[in-house]
Regions:
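A short, aliphatic-rich alpha-helical micro-motif
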Residues: 2, 141-142, 195-196
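Conserved phosphate-binding/catalytic loop of the ribokinase/pfkB sugar-kinase fold
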Residues: 100-104, 113-158
Length: 333
């Protein structure tokens, strides 16, 4: 009998084109609406170099992360019938991810995003193609222990209902929800079935404020509101301040793993954290153990370009954990 799938990722897959900006050709300003990347308008600007990375995106990054950590992984996604789509499928297969549920859309192009890379930060220009989303029929051996649902096009709202219907019919399947931009904008009322079904939800602090409607400075308030939606385990990442997690019984703070060198760029740090946290739970780790694993993969990812090059195997991750300083542990808050 075939081994059961451990994790099934759901979401859009993209090709990222990184454009490394020259430091003195742009600058960052800040106002009450946030930080802004500023460049001279209406002229030609030199750039350092460009890199193209295939088969990325929140859900794809999670699938690669889970597969490298030893989980049997599959992926439900859409690509166009172009060379980029074929290249992305091959990239997934190279990572030992089952691509039998990847749908190739005739006469459609594949998703392409452009990443403006300035110093160690990035601004991503996104555009999701309008595919016809529908939930596939899964054979018994394709039914996973975990579903990892993340960023998807804004025209896929009804698809969320199909996923929710399927989850209702398979109550033993655990859901990890890392909502993307359009999913958060859809609101908690529209996607209430997914929030209520979530075994794990991972958000950064800004996203947690938006989704919960709580006060950004009050973590406990945001946790209370997110648990009230039905989410069992909630994780809020907070940049240089580390991450916080709540399972309804305990609330823990986890520091960042120290960087061995200055970060190269930060694309995929959040995806690495979220997916590694979920993979750790799927492999039987405790909440504290999952919190120890996740920052290590984030640390490794930011040492490379893009969201996947730095993703670790379980052996590599455990080697970093063995070298962790004494203070690298979860504490109550």
């Amino acid at each position: 009998m075939a081994r059961q799938t451990d994790l099934l990722a759901i979401g859009d897959i993209v090709t990222d084109a990184f454009i490394k900006l020259i430091d003195d050709q742009a600058y960052v300003t800040e106002n009450d609406q946030g930080k802004w990347l500023t460049m001279q308008f209406g002229t030609k600007l030199p750039f350092d170099h460009a890199e193209v990375l295939e088969g990325v995106g929140n859900a794809s990054n999670a699938a690669v992360s889970a597969s490298r950590l030893g989980l049997k992984t599959s992926f439900v996604t859409n690509v166009g019938d172009d060379k980029e789509g074929l290249s992305m499928i091959r990239a997934l297969q190279k990572e030992k991810i089952d691509t039998s549920l990847v749908r190739v859309n005739a006469r459609k192009v594949s998703n392409m995003h452009y990443v403006l890379w300035y110093k160690e930060e990035r601004t991503i220009l996104i555009n999701h193609e309008n595919y016809k989303y529908y939930w596939p029929h899964l054979r018994p051996d394709e039914i996973p222990r975990w579903v990892y649902f993340s960023s998807i096009s804004e025209n896929a709202l009804e698809y969320h209902d199909q996923v929710s219907d399927w989850l209702d019919k398979h109550p033993d399947v655990k859901l990890a929800f890392q909502p993307g931009t359009f999913q958060m904008k859809a609101g908690t009322e529209r996607l209430k079935r997914l929030y209520a079904r979530s075994e794990v939800m991972v958000l950064n602090r800004e996203e947690a404020e938006f989704v919960s409607g709580g006060k950004r400075e009050d973590l406990h308030d945001m946790f209370d509101r997110l648990h009230a939606l039905g989410c069992k385990i909630v994780v809020i990442t907070d940049g240089p301040d580390g991450a916080y997690a709540s399972d309804g019984n305990q609330r823990l703070k986890m520091p960042l793993y120290p960087d061995p060198a200055p970060p190269k760029e930060r694309t995929g740090a959040g995806d690495a954290f979220a997916s590694t946290f979920v993979a750790a739970l799927a492999k039987g780790n405790s909440l504290e153990g999952a919190l120890q694993w996740a920052p290590i993969n984030s640390m490794s990812v930011v040492q490379q370009t893009g969201a996947q090059a730095g993703l670790l195997t379980e052996k590599e991750l455990e080697e970093w954990l063995a070298k962790a300083p004494e203070w690298y542990k979860a504490t109550q808050f």
